[in-house]
Regions:
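Early extracytoplasmic/domain-onset interaction patches
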Residues: 22-60, 141-144
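Intrinsic-disorder/low-complexity, polar/charged segments enriched in Ser/Thr/Lys/Arg/Asp/Glu/Gln
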Residues: 24-26, 38-42, 52-54, 105-107, ...
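Juxtacatalytic substrate-recognition/specificity segment
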Residues: 204-333
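Bacterial Sec-dependent N-terminal signal peptides
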Residues: 1-26
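C-terminal recognition in membrane/secretory proteostasis and scaffolding
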Residues: 345-346, 354-608
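Solvent-exposed coil/turn segments that connect beta secondary-structure elements
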Residues: 60, 102, 113-115, 164, ...
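Non-catalytic architectural context of zinc metalloproteases
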Residues: 44, 67-76, 80-240, 244-252, ...
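An active-site-proximal "capping" alpha-helix that borders the catalytic cofactor pocket
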Residues: 77, 242, 336-348
Length: 608
């Protein structure tokens, strides 16, 4: 018997039996014909012998941990046979359509609405949403436009995008079509497709290479206030520092940053921040943000998302590897996916000299203060596994506060046990070698693996503070590095005093008022402001209830000695007063290095 021939025949038979699972899912998106602010999507139905076939778009996507129901934004769903005749379709839930006589189906087609201009009607985080602005911009988070057939999510996807010649698609994907008005992208499965956002706009991008990684920075600024070139030097400095911090850790050869700047003069995106993907990040920020403040925000926001190349890209559980977009089982380890990532986004900045030691301590103290407002006795693993439901979902933001502090304490514990030679970054590199992007771990095995790679005391920490309800005494961990608690000076906000706001609203006129008899800061008094005055404008920009969020945002960007002109109104009379800003100073709980006997250990922690 020819064993090789028989084996080949067997493989061929298996392949034929499941041949439909190997066919390419072909999707076409037409950005040329935008009707009623909608884009048409056409999907070829894979060859099948089923009487019914389900097509779903995500209810949930990785990284958001919220139920967003993208099916709400799909209309006119049709299934057609080879002759273009409609087949019966039944909508089984908000995100799923059942195609009857599926073996006769040739294509499906539907219209997709965007989310940015209707953000008052939903809670989708803007970086996970979509924008359709004919001829100008298309923010295509692919999960908002494209779904999957049941049983075919592992098939390769071929996405063809027809677009106006003046628009260019920024993405980490490779365009396989050389024409100016059509792009073709291929991914190995649906999960890969939804991890690759694309932003179409008039070309405004830069590229640079950092240690073998190609970085793309693409910007859409509707009023041309910001360009990719204007932020690239700071982005290059930051990402170079990140790669230096990571050392020999390599996870991807290309990374794209897609920055959408929201126009506050019209209905537009309001959820500012970013959403990570393995080889890219989508970022949404207000266009009115001063350029220097935008650069600072990007340094923190993008660095967090970039560090996701460590986890979950290179280290993740089976729940993430086999993510069910409509009925997911959540992993227990958000402390790692988000907490370690957030810690790295701060640690690398002190490690690479981008911030001072005092600033690093201030940031960690701020996280302690924020975490203190959350449930400190809720086991992090339990919260993580149940993050989609109350009361656990209400604690999600703690992954960026207590989650980062957990990572810091683990880092300190490992540094202490290894006499400064190893830290949590070394642990993550070991875990990456153990698993990597293609090998997922069992949720229940991770703590044992970490313990085996480190010390028994680390296992005790994991069970007590992450799997258990015990609050962490953070000051004790700082003390291990020679850092002690103290009161430190901090610059406050001119519209807040003793944690109380100084502004209120007249509901009848929508005017912003200084609260009568409120204890104003000296700077405001020097401007002649009194309680009860109406705040009409600052530096010529008028404010009211309608744009009070912009006023609050402005106040956070105010720097010492900035020249400021206040327009106030008292008894119907307006007055302009100009002065240099003097920010209020307050003493807040913080940390400083005091034990010189531990200098070497502290240096290994922050600079090693």
């Amino acid at each position: 018997m020819n064993t090789k021939h028989t084996l080949f025949a067997l493989l061929l038979a298996i392949s034929s039996a499941s041949g439909w699972s190997q066919s390419k899912i072909q999707v076409t998106m037409d950005l040329n014909k935008v009707i009623h602010d909608q884009v048409t999507v056409t999907v070829k139905v894979p060859v099948n012998s089923a009487s019914t076939l389900l097509y779903s778009v995500p209810k949930i996507i990785p990284g958001t941990y919220s139920e967003d129901d993208y099916g709400k934004y799909i209309e006119q769903f049709k299934a057609l046979d080879a002759n273009g005749k409609p087949l019966t379709v039944t909508k089984t839930d908000v995100n799923t359509w059942q195609i009857n006589n599926a073996n006769k189906a040739k294509t499906i087609t539907y219209q997709v609405n965007d989310t940015y201009d209707i953000e008052d009607t939903h809670e989708i985080f803007s970086p996970a949403g979509s924008n359709i602005e004919a001829g100008k911009n298309f923010m295509i988070n692919t999960h908002a436009f494209i779904g999957y057939f049941e049983g075919f999510a592992q098939n390769p996807y071929e996405l063809t995008v027809l677009h106006p010649e003046q628009l260019w698609g920024a993405t980490a994907l490779t365009d396989l079509d050389a024409s100016k008005n059509k792009d073709v992208f291929v991914t190995n499965r649906y999960a890969s497709l939804v991890e690759h956002p694309i932003m179409y706009a008039q070309p405004d991008y830069t590229t640079f290479t950092v240690q073998g990684m190609e970085i793309l920075i693409a910007v859409y600024s509707p009023n041309r206030k910001v360009t990719a070139a204007s932020i690239t030097p700071e982005m290059k400095q930051m990402m170079t520092a990140q790669k230096n911090f990571l050392g020999d850790f390599n996870a991807t050869k290309k990374y794209a940053v897609l920055l959408y700047l929201s126009d506050n003069t019209k209905p537009d995106a309001e959820g500012f921040g970013a959403l990570e993907h393995p080889t890219s990040t989508t970022v949404v920020m207000p266009e009115m943000l001063p350029i220097d403040e935008l650069k600072e925000q990007l340094k923190d926001v993008v660095s967090h998302e970039f560090f996701h190349i460590v986890t979950p890209l290179s280290i993740h559980s089976k729940e993430i590897a086999n993510f069910d977009y409509n009925n997911p089982k959540m992993s227990q380890h958000l402390w790692m996916y988000e907490g370690v990532t957030e810690y790295f986004a701060n640690l690398f900045q002190i490690n690479q000299g981008l911030i001072t030691e005092a600033e690093f301590y201030k940031r960690m103290a701020g996280k302690m203060a924020n975490a203190s407002t959350m449930n400190d006795q809720m086991p992090f693993t339990k919260m993580s596994a149940n993050v989609l439901t109350k009361p656990y979902k209400d604690q999600y933001l703690n992954v960026y506060e207590k989650g980062a502090l957990i990572a810091m304490c683990l880092d300190i514990e490992i540094r202490e046990k290894s006499l400064g030679k190893r830290g949590i970054l070394d642990l993550m590199k070991q875990l990456s070698k153990e698993y990597g992007a293609e090998k997922a771990f069992d949720d229940a095995e991770l703590f044992a693996k970490i313990t085996a790679l480190t010390y028994p005391e680390i296992g005790i920490f994991l069970e007590k503070y992450i799997n258990g309800p015990t609050p962490i005494a953070y000051a004790d961990y700082f003390a291990k590095m020679g850092v002690t608690q103290t009161m430190v000076a901090s610059e406050g906000n001119i519209f807040i005093k003793e944690q109380a706001p100084l502004l209120t609203i007249n509901p009848d006129t929508k005017e912003i008022l200084f609260i009568p008899h409120a204890p104003l800061h000296p700077f405001l008094k020097n401007l002649g402001v009194e309680g009860g005055d109406v705040l009409v404008a600052i530096n010529g920009t008028k404010y009211s209830l309608d744009n009070i969020n912009e006023l609050i945002l402005w106040s956070t960007t105010l720097q010492e000695n900035d020249e400021v002109t206040f327009t106030t109104k008292r008894n119907g009379v307006e007055k302009n007063t100009t002065a240099k800003a003097v920010l209020p100073k307050e003493m807040i709980p913080g940390f400083e290095f005091t034990d010189t006997a531990k200098s070497a250990l502290k240096e290994a922690w922050l600079k090693g």
